[in-house]
Amino acid sequence: MKIQIINKSRHDLPNYETIASAGMDLRANIIEPITLKPLERTIVKTGLFIELPIGYEAQVRPRSGLAAKKGVTVLNSPGTVDADYRGEIGVILVNLSNEEFVIENGERIAQLIIAKHERAEWIEVEELSETSRGEGGFGSTGVK
C-alpha cells in the first residue's frame, strides 16, 4: 500500500523496524527539549502530514518500552488520524511516572499503525438477541 506523505521534520520517514512490525515509530520534531513533569501532558509535533485512502485510518499508539521503562504513554490511545485529516500529526503524551521526563528532538515517541476500517449502518430494533453473557460486563466473566 502506498500513502502520500509530506515530511517537514528534520528526520527520516517512519519505517518498520523489523519485517513483522505492525507499527512505524514516530519521532518528536521539536526545536528544543520538552520537560514533562509527573502527570503533565503535552502535544508533541512530528512534522508529518499524510493522505490516507478512504476506508483507512492511522492509529497513534504508545511505544511499549517508553511506557514500561519511563511511565510515558499516549493519552488518547489509540489516537486516530482520519483519512480526510490533512494537518500535522501530533502525539498527546502524558507522564504517569513520579519523575520528570525530557523529550528530545528525534526521540521515538509513539507508533503509527495503518488500519482498514468499516463504516457501520445502524439498524434500530426493539430488542437484541440473547447470549449466555447477557448484560454482564466490567469483570463479569471473572478476574482469573
UniProtKB/Swiss-Prot annotation:
GO terms of molecular function: dUTP diphosphatase activity; magnesium ion binding
Family statement drawn from the similarity comment of this UniProt entry: Belongs to the dUTPase family.
Entry protein name: Deoxyuridine 5'-triphosphate nucleotidohydrolase
Catalytic activity: dUTP + H2O = dUMP + diphosphate + H(+)
Keywords per UniProt: Hydrolase, Magnesium, Metal-binding, Nucleotide metabolism
SUPFAM superfamilies in the record: dUTPase-like (SSF51283)
A single GO BP: dUMP biosynthetic process
Disulphide-bonded residues: none
Enzyme class (EC, first level): hydrolase
Job of this protein: This enzyme is involved in nucleotide metabolism: it produces dUMP, the immediate precursor of thymidine nucleotides and it decreases the intracellular concentration of dUTP so that uracil cannot be incorporated into DNA.
The encoding gene: dut
Tagged with keyword Electron transport: no
UniProt-annotated binding residues for substrate: 63-65, 76, 80-82
Catalytic activity, EC: 3.6.1.23
The organism of origin for this protein: Flavobacterium johnsoniae (strain ATCC 17061 / DSM 2064 / JCM 8514 / BCRC 14874 / CCUG 350202 / NBRC 14942 / NCIMB 11054 / UW101)
Cofactor requirement: Mg(2+)
Pathway(s) served: Pyrimidine metabolism; dUMP biosynthesis; dUMP from dCTP (dUTP route): step 2/2
PANTHER family in UniProt: DEOXYURIDINE 5'-TRIPHOSPHATE NUCLEOTIDOHYDROLASE (PTHR11241:SF0)
NCBIfam families: dut, PRK00601.1
